[in-house]
């Protein structure tokens, strides 16, 4: 269950069992809505209230600030705590919504497989070329924002440890999607391969992260390019694309 416009790592939940309460909470999370009841709030200590408000304000796991309440827009955790302290004296519960809330959510089946990410380039001959894909081994069920950027929460293995046939199949499918969507210069395509070798491509991305630990540079190293060489190649291939515009 995830928002329709936030990619694959913000507001995402996995429903592991038939549980209406968990389902409701997951839908609310995807809509960036938070409910808090008076009994729960008033049982918190002052420190716990502030910690809760900070967590709600963090878009990576909460709903993000500013938040909308019945009477006003709030921009800071301390202001939210003060508001709830007053509001929940005379009210049973409070509904908090993110300022930029979603209008739709996506409910989709969980793909049980090995997750990968593949950089695809448009070379100087205008052919799509997929680099050796990277497998993402997560400590949890979702490769979310924290797993991407906090050390120790995921491992990256380049290339993904599958048979040569499956490796080539992944690259071919990524190249096919790259051409179908009309990408230019380069893109990152994420997906899964299951135990039967079926490939699911679920997240095409026009840009790719360029941190030192990013797939972008891992995969370039597999074909013998250091970061400077790879960026020079990207720039050289980008210039003709911009001239077309």
What is the meaning of each model-derived region?
Residues 163-245:
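ATP-dependent carboxylate activation and anion-phosphoryl transfer catalytic cores
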Residues 23-38, 126-150:
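Mobile, glycine-enriched helix-loop/loop "lid" segments at the mouths of ligand-binding/catalytic clefts
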Residues 1-106, 112, 124:
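Active-site nucleotide/adenylate-binding loops and adjacent lid/helix of ATP-dependent enzymes
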Residues 79-111, 115, 149-194:
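A long amphipathic alpha-helix within ATP-dependent nucleotide-binding catalytic cores
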Residues 116-120:
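Short beta-strand scaffold segments in enzyme catalytic cores
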Residues 122-127, 194-197:
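Short acidic-glycine loop/turn motifs at beta-strand connectors
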Residues 8-9, 155-157, 211-216:
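Short small-residue beta-strand/loop micro-motif enriched in glycine and branched aliphatics
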Residues 9, 115, 127-128, 199:
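Short, mixed charged/polar active-site loops
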């Amino acid at each position: 269950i995830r928002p329709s416009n936030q990619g694959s790592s913000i507001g995402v939940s996995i429903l592991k069992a038939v549980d209406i309460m968990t389902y409701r909470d997951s839908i609310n999370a995807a809509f960036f809505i938070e409910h808090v009841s008076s009994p729960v709030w008033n049982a918190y200590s002052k420190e716990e209230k502030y910690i809760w408000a900070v967590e709600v304000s963090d878009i990576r796991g909460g709903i993000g600030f500013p938040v909308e309440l019945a009477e006003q827009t709030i921009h800071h955790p301390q202001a939210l705590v003060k508001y709830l302290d007053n509001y929940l004296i005379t009210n049973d519960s409070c509904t908090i919504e993110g300022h930029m809330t979603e209008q739709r959510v996506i409910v989709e089946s969980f793909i049980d497989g090995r997750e990968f990410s593949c950089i695809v380039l448009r070379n100087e001959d205008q052919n799509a070329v997929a680099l050796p894909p990277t497998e993402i081994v997560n400590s949890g069920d979702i490769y979310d924002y924290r797993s991407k950027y906090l050390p120790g929460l995921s491992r990256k293995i380049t290339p993904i440890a599958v048979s040569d046939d499956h490796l080539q199949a992944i690259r071919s499918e990524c190249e096919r999607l790259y051409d179908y969507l009309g990408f230019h210069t380069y893109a990152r395509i994420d997906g899964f391969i299951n135990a039967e070798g079926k490939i699911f491509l679920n997240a095409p991305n026009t840009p790719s992260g360029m941190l030192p630990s990013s797939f972008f540079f891992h995969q370039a190293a597999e074909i013998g390019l250091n970061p400077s060489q790879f960026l020079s190649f990207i720039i050289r291939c980008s210039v003709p694309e911009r001239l077309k515009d």
